[in-house]
């Protein structure tokens, strides 16, 4: 009994000496204090056996694994620090900012699911206007680019009259202005950010009327070969007829007005997009017509040879353009035609 009392006094003395050390260790362990469970989940039997003597053996000096239960080992050796949700909020805000930038640059529709974490409701009336290719998709006919295209269309019959009356110099100047307007209407539309559905039909139609009128008048004056003019006119008629036929098949031959036929006032109007080979062909045709107009007043046998070469070039690009549109038509043919075939 005397030995037990002496050991107990020795333990109490050591406990007083080591109390500041354990207090400091516990304070530096973290800002959150955890209350250990009554029994250790990993060693329940071991904790139950030592529980009567734990108040005497825990504060002893020496290694921690000999004097502390498992949960106190974790608190003393590995401090716990709870991280706040500030970093998570910052990541969410950064994600929203990136998604907004992506939508503003690429104009992705919200139906694709690229929406921010915090909902942002934006309602757009699709029947009023639609933004495409950097400009407003407008249905109105009255605008500057369409007026330029209309002036080029009207210039075709005027140039026909000039060539028929052998006013070649005046016809050349008029053709130069009309040819420049083919570039000008597109430039003005881009500068004014006008994306007109009617203009997409009017621009190629004006080119065909201009070239057709001038070519027919030049055949009458023996300035161009009739075979070449026939190829050009047949190609234009085939393109216009094929486009109308394809549109009618898509509508199942049912429409009320021409506005419905061309879908000018629908939610997704169909524009006419010319191929690159067609634009190149138009440039070669205008160059040939301009050179042939000047041939009677300023030409010679050498220039006539160059006009012959250019005529063959125009015939080649005309047939190549026709073939390219045929391939495009075959790829975009209606589903009803695919089922029939």
From Swiss-Prot:
Description of the deletion phenotype: Strong dwarf phenotype, small siliques with only a few small-sized and sterile seeds, when grown in long day conditions under low light. Dysfunction of mitochondria: abnormal ultrastructure, reduced content of respiratory complex I/complex III supercomplexes and marked accumulation of tricarboxylic acid cycle derivatives and amino acids.
UniProt entry tagged with the keyword Magnesium: no
Protein name: Cardiolipin synthase (CMP-forming)
UniProt enzyme class: transferase
pH dependence: Optimum pH is about 9.0.
Family label: Belongs to the CDP-alcohol phosphatidyltransferase class-I family.
Gene3D superfamilies: 1.20.120.1760
Signal peptide as annotated in the record: none
InterPro entries found in the cross-reference section: CDP-alcohol_PTase-I, CDP-OH_P_trans, CDP-OH_PTrfase_TM_dom, CDP_ALCOHOL_P_TRANSF_CS
Known EC number: 2.7.8.41
């Amino acid at each position: 009994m005397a030995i037990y009392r002496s050991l107990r006094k020795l333990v109490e003395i050591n406990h007083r000496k080591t109390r500041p050390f354990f207090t400091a260790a516990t304070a530096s362990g973290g800002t959150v204090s955890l209350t250990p469970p009554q029994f250790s989940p990993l060693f329940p039997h071991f904790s139950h056996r030592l529980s009567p003597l734990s108040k005497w053996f825990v504060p002893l000096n020496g290694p921690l694994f000999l004097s502390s239960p498992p949960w106190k080992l974790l608190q003393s050796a590995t401090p716990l620090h709870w991280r706040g949700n500030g970093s998570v909020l910052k990541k969410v805000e950064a994600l929203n900012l990136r998604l907004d930038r992506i939508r503003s640059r690429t104009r992705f529709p919200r139906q694709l699911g690229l929406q921010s974490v915090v909902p942002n409701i934006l309602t757009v009336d699709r029947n009023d206007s639609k933004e495409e290719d950097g400009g407003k998709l407008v249905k109105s006919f009255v605008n500057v680019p369409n007026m330029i295209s209309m002036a080029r269309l009207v210039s075709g019959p005027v140039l026909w009259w000039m060539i028929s009356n052998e006013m070649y110099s005046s016809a050349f100047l008029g053709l130069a202005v009309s040819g420049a307007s083919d570039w000008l209407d597109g430039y003005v539309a881009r500068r004014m950010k006008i994306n007109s559905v009617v203009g997409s039909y009017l621009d190629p139609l004006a080119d065909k009327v201009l070239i057709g009128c001038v070519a027919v008048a030049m055949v009458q004056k023996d300035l161009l070969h009739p075979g070449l003019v026939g190829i050009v006119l047949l190609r234009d008629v085939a393109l216009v007829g094929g486009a109308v036929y394809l549109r009618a098949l898509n509508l199942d031959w049912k429409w009320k007005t021409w506005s419905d036929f061309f879908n000018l006032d629908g939610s997704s109007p169909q524009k006419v997009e010319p191929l690159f080979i067609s634009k190149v062909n138009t440039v070669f045709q205008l160059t040939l017509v301009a050179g042939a107009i000047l041939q009677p007043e300023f030409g010679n046998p050498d220039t006539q040879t160059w006009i012959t070469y250019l005529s063959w070039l125009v015939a080649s690009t005309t047939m190549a353009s026709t073939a390219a549109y045929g391939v495009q038509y075959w790829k975009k043919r209606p589903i009803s035609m695919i089922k029939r075939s």
